[in-house]
A protein has these predicted regions:
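Cysteine-centered metal-binding/redox modules
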Residues: 7, 15-152
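N-terminal intrinsically disordered, low-complexity leader regions
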Residues: 1, 11-13
Length: 152
């Protein structure tokens, strides 16, 4: 009798794990909800210097973030969302984006650090070297981490 109960529990557990895995593979909520995306983006502008608003007209943005990082403007200008470790432009993430994702100045991707759609020509003060994410497998790992699951 104990064997059947154990088997049933195991089947239920496997089923739950499959549901969780599917959840991690879904599009991040902010890619599908403009209000949530805007809220997260605005918080990143306010708290983490996300910018410049218009990459073609940056104003004094690069000077300000260079001061924040205690570096040169030239160095700051190379630290972009497009080469940040949390910037996701994997095939699966591009499928989550609404419409056209690129223009002459860059590409729209997803920021796993701040949970919003961001542009590759911008930056923020939490930039970290090592990106972008171009592989679906790596994107899924970031998705798991975003939902609080430890990496295997």
């Amino acid at each position: 009798m104990g064997g059947k109960t154990t088997h049933t529990k195991r089947v239920k557990m496997i089923s739950l794990l499959r549901l969780l895995e599917q959840k991690f593979k879904e599009c991040p909520p902010a890619t599908q909800d403009v209000d949530l995306n805007t809220k997260n983006r605005d918080e990143t502008v306010k708290n983490h210097m996300y910018g410049p608003l218009n990459p073609d007209e940056p104003g004094d943005y690069w000077e300000k973030i260079a001061d924040k990082w205690n570096t040169s403007v030239e160095a700051a200008r190379t630290s972009l969302c497009g080469n940040c470790t949390a910037f996701d432009i994997s095939p699966r993430m591009l499928e989550c984006m609404p419409g056209e994702v690129s223009d002459e100045s860059g590409v729209l991707g997803y920021c796993w650090m701040h949970h919003f759609k961001c542009h590759s020509a911008r930056s923020c003060n939490t930039w970290a070297k090592g990106g972008p994410i171009k592989d679906d497998k790596i994107s899924y790992i970031w998705g798991k981490k975003a939902f609080g699951e430890k990496d295997d």
